[in-house]
Structure formats: C-alpha cells, structure tokens
C-alpha cells in the first residue's frame, strides 16, 4: 500500500550477478522509496546484448527477492521498449534536434574525448552513422539531495553526445530518460559513478520538454585496491545464504542506525526496521572499501 506520489526505481544491466556495490544501490533506492510510502520499480536495462551474460537477468531478480527487496508492478525490460526509443529519436529528428555523425572513435580520441560538433552542419545520411543530440540546453549544474549542488564539466555538459550508436544500438542516456519518464520516476537513487552522465540526461529532459526527476548519488563500495566494485573487475556475487548479515553490513555502509538483535529478526522485519529508521542525511558521500561481511555478526 502506498499513499505517496514518490516513484523510485532500481535499473541493473544483466552483465552479471549483483554484488555488494549493486546491493548498496538497490537497498538505498528501496529504502528511500519505502520510507516515503512510495512505489519502487525494477527495470532490466538489457539494450546492449554484447555486454549481457545469459541468465543474468533472471538471477538478478532472484537475488532481489532473496534479499527481501520486492518491487511494485511488472518488471520493465528495455529490450521490449525499442519502439518507444525509435519514436523518441524520430521526434528529435523532426524537431531538428539531432543529426547523423560519421566521425570515427579515433578522431574523437585525438580531440581528447570530447566531440567538437564536426558533423553538425554536414547533413549526413543514416548509413554507417551514429545519431547525436544537437545540444540546445546544456546543464551546468544540478541539485543532488545528498550531495547538494554539483557542478558539471562545461565541455562535457555542452557536448553533442550520442543517442543512437553506429552499430544500431540505442544509447544508454536516451533509453534511461525515455523509460524514467514513461515509468513516472520522481527520484533516481543510484551510485556516484553515474554523476557524470546526469547532466546529459537532464539536458534530454529539457529537449523533450519533460519534467526531470530528483537525484541522489550514493557512495561507491570499493575493493581493497581502491577500485569500484563492479562486474568488470570481478566483484564477488552476493552470498546465496542468509541475507541478513549482508543487509546489516549494507545498512552500516549507508550510515544507518545499527540493528540491535538482528539475528532474532526475519528479513522482512529487518527491512521494516530499516525503512522506519531510514535517514538520507546519515548516508556518507565518500566512497569506502567494501567491509568484510563477517563483521556484521559483531
């Protein structure tokens, strides 16, 4: 039962199983939504087949359920949303807000990684071309409910970024904006590694004339080498046994009130306690090394 207009979401890509860093993002977004008696949705961002691991999407959903993170409504699959993305691309093209670009990656690398708008006035056709947004509304800063005002890199914010790839795949920034708007998401709670693309996504909201959601970027969990826990650096999957000690460790990572006698609680009771005592203001802003799960039993 919800009595709030708040809608949050967790949107993993099926490039591997969830790990502790994924749990931080999932749990943080879940608690932020439930604490406001809001809706919490799950979306599988399966628009990049070369990066996807067979069976990972089903495993991710099982992991969420195992950890007591039950979502509202049906899971949205980006692989079933291609028509919506095509419609968005067509609208931008009709409005003169996008163009075809044939510049190779090597040219952009020579420029330092920021595209210079070379193809903006060249009137290329779609053959062997990417589609770039014609940036009209660069966003130079935005408010993060945890971190305050975040300033963007001016060059990055002003760049004509890709919204449809040369290989025919829809770009992440386009798909995520179209889907968050479609799902009515009011606030996005995710990891701090996604701070940088936020200004691009906000500029797309302006291009489409849509109301943008709020943002919260949670601290990243790091490995012992100081690198972000990720599927790419082989972060271990979440434990398949008792989820409670891992949930307690995740709550501590998020700066939340310690759960006394959690061993006597069910997963559902533990999460109800966490929702009742959730404080976004207690969440740290700096990344931290993934703590040893065994410490949860202290």
Curated annotation (Swiss-Prot):
UniProt short sequence motif 'HIGH' region, positions renumbered to this chain: 12-22
Bound cofactor: record note: Binds 1 zinc ion per subunit.
Residues where ATP binds: 231
Protein name as it appears in the record: Glutamyl-Q tRNA(Asp) synthetase
Pfam family, one: tRNA-synt_1c
Enzyme class (EC, first level): ligase
Keywords: Aminoacyl-tRNA synthetase, ATP-binding, Ligase, Metal-binding, Nucleotide-binding, Zinc
Annotated EC: 6.1.1.-
Gene Ontology CC annotations of this record: cytosol
Protein task: Catalyzes the tRNA-independent activation of glutamate in presence of ATP and the subsequent transfer of glutamate onto a tRNA(Asp). Glutamate is transferred on the 2-amino-5-(4,5-dihydroxy-2-cyclopenten-1-yl) moiety of the queuosine in the wobble position of the QUC anticodon.
Protein family: Belongs to the class-I aminoacyl-tRNA synthetase family. GluQ subfamily.
Binding site for L-glutamate: 9-13, 45, 172, 190
Gene3D superfamilies: HUPs
